[in-house]
Design a protein with these regions (language model features):
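Secretory targeting and sorting signals
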Residues: 1-34, 42
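Predominantly soluble domains enriched in secretory-pathway, periplasmic, or organellar proteins
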Residues: 22, 28-380
């Protein structure tokens, strides 16, 4: 398939933005209307009965079951082996070197012992006006979440329906919230600088990233809007997830498989590099050598855009685009860097209950059952 680039078609403007929000699914649009019942994709995966609980092997996957109240442990060869109840609609998760997972749910941040496979605590949010814990893309509560490099603090982005969100700082030893910092609307993703001095909240509905000083909790807003902000809450062309580049600490935001926005968090300046997948993009991760992986969820406009894919972008900018079957949301990479695991949960319609396992060398893919609408993922 010939993939069109940003240079090969007109720049999208408000007409496309508003038309997409009206005609297509409203998953990325900032609305607080009640969602219709979500229906998963009908593409089948072969279920595997959970195995008895036991020692969690290295390389086991942990996924957040956004359509349930659990996290699921997944053998990357066989499928689910166990699950642990954590709280309503878990979204993102982060795992420390001590094996404890911190899971952002609608109710609070759950702490899970991944070795014993049990929940140790549920830390309630201090942010107000979250509403009753519920399911759906626009629910109140935790979204993106990240650990400080030294493991002493967790930072969770908290969505406040119809308002700006917050980043809550949690002391991991005390297991309590120590600070609540205002940020933009719907903090999809949270990342931390290499030295732990700054926290970055990707504010989906504000077209920006909020830079939070980890000590003083002072904030700076940096706009991330390569297509402009026309359309406001109805726009699809917003930032979703970011990656911190290991070589220089700059933030990488993929947009539409056309543009990679590279933000210098120190100066607030950004540059744009060309991408080639030509598809709406959500989850990202980056490997220690600087290889960026970006999840393409599928087209905004089927007449213009390509289908779901995984972009593997080398540090020199060369890209391999691997087609995927159906929408996906987030991605993690095996310790040896050879395999990617892409969650099928998705924040919009078309989600499915599994992950796609991608051989990054050959580009071969296979589907694996995994939880209920899995979003966040980590390799244990």
């Amino acid at each position: 398939v010939t993939r069109r680039t940003a240079e090969g078609r007109p720049v999208r403007r408000a007409a496309l933005t508003l038309a997409a929000a009206t005609v297509l699914l409203a998953g990325c649009a900032g609305t607080t209307q009640a969602e219709p019942d979500r229906k998963p994709s009908t593409v089948p995966v072969t279920p595997t009965a959970p195995a008895p609980s036991g020692r969690t092997a290295d390389g086991t996957l942990l996924v957040a079951d956004f359509g349930a109240d659990t996290v699921t442990f997944v053998d990357p060869d066989k499928g689910p082996v166990d699950s642990v109840k954590v709280g309503t609609a878990p979204y993102g998760l982060a795992v420390g070197e001590d094996g404890r997972a911190w899971v952002a749910t609608a109710e609070g941040v759950a702490v899970v012992d991944t070795e014993a496979r049990r929940r140790l605590a549920l830390i309630p949010y201090e942010t107000e006006n979250l509403g009753e814990p519920t399911h759906g893309e626009y629910r109140g509560g935790g979204m993106g979440i990240a650990l400080a490099p030294d493991g002493k603090h967790v930072y969770v982005g908290v969505n406040v329906p119809d308002a700006n969100g917050t980043v809550e700082t949690i002391d991991t030893a005390a297991r309590e919230v120590t600070d609540v910092t205002p940020v933009g609307r719907r903090p999809f993703d949270v990342d931390v600088s290499r030295d732990g001095d700054e926290v970055y909240a990707t504010d989906h509905d504000s077209f920006d990233v909020t830079v939070v000083d980890a000590r003083s909790h002072d904030t700076r807003r940096i706009e991330v809007a390569p297509y402009g902000t026309e359309g406001g809450l109805g726009s699809w062309l917003k930032p979703h997830y970011a990656a911190v580049r290991p070589s220089d600490g700059k933030l990488l935001f993929p947009f539409e498989g056309e543009k990679l926005v590279v933000v210098d968090p120190d100066t607030g300046r950004s540059t744009i590099e060309r991408m080639t997948a030509n598809t709406h993009q959500h989850g990202v991760t980056i490997t220690p050598d600087g290889t960026l992986l970006a999840v393409g969820t599928g087209p905004i406009d089927p007449a213009e855009d390509e289908g779901p894919s995984l972009t593997v972008r080398a540090p020199d900018g060369k890209e391999k685009v691997i087609p995927l079957d159906g929408p996906h949301e987030d991605v993690a990479v095996s310790a040896d860097g050879r395999t990617a695991y892409v969650t099928g949960g998705f924040t919009r319609d078309g989600y499915w209950n599994g992950i796609t396992v991608v051989d990054l060398g050959s580009g071969d893919t296979r589907r694996l059952p995994a939880g209920e609408r899995p979003l966040g993922i980590a390799v244990l």
